[in-house]
């Protein structure tokens, strides 16, 4: 039986790592406007002329700015013309505005850990495909009073990788420092990627062992160096 190698042995460049490309492209096209019609016009223009400096696109920008100007409503000093809001209505209205839940998704978790440096190679875990976006699961309702969970499956470059535990520890430290306390973090080796898969999994998810490892100054120093490259 041939030895397992990382499913994606090709080293990725930083600009090849998964990002929220669609959102950033849309923001670039809109250029500060929230008008969907503007987005459509610019998209069509960029298919003809890919230069953001084109004269046609600049003319459209000027037109958009003119169209965005609104004539202010006529001011009035007649306060009696406004319906008075009762105390009951003001109290009831106060509860209508609810903050949208701040959800944390797989992309956000990936952004936190992809730039961790590999302890052996001068590359990041994302570049080596040790961590992959599709191997991250997040269960988060957004409710600050409910527990949430992050499950990450890492892929060592070789089946006998002696640094798999250290890499997992680096990921755990990074997430524990970045995420709210309500998140439960589970780090696993991807099935079939390591000779000591079960043993390493137990070490990475044993609270007492992790706490003891973090008290080791030498080990913590190595982890800190791994996290220096995080963005």
Curated annotation (Swiss-Prot):
Gene3D superfamilies with a match to the protein in the record: 6.10.250.1280, Fe-S cluster assembly (FSCA)
Role description: May play a role in chromosome segregation through establishment of sister chromatid cohesion.
One Pfam family this sequence matches: FeS_assembly_P
Name of the protein in question: MIP18 family protein YHR122W
Note: Present with 1800 molecules/cell in log phase SD medium.
Protein family per UniProt: Belongs to the MIP18 family.
Keyword annotations from UniProtKB, A to Z: Acetylation, Chromosome partition
Transit peptide as UniProt keyword: no
Ranges of biased composition (kind: Acidic residues): 76-90
N-acetylserine modified-residue sites: 2
Organism per entry: Saccharomyces cerevisiae (strain ATCC 204508 / S288c)
Coiled-coil stretches noted in the UniProt entry, renumbered to this chain: none
Disulfide bonds: none
Gene Ontology process terms (BP): chromosome segregation; iron-sulfur cluster assembly; protein maturation
Segments of this protein annotated with the region Disordered: 1-26, 75-100
Classification via InterPro entries: FSCA_dom_sf (IPR034904), MIP18 (IPR039796), MIP18-like (IPR002744)
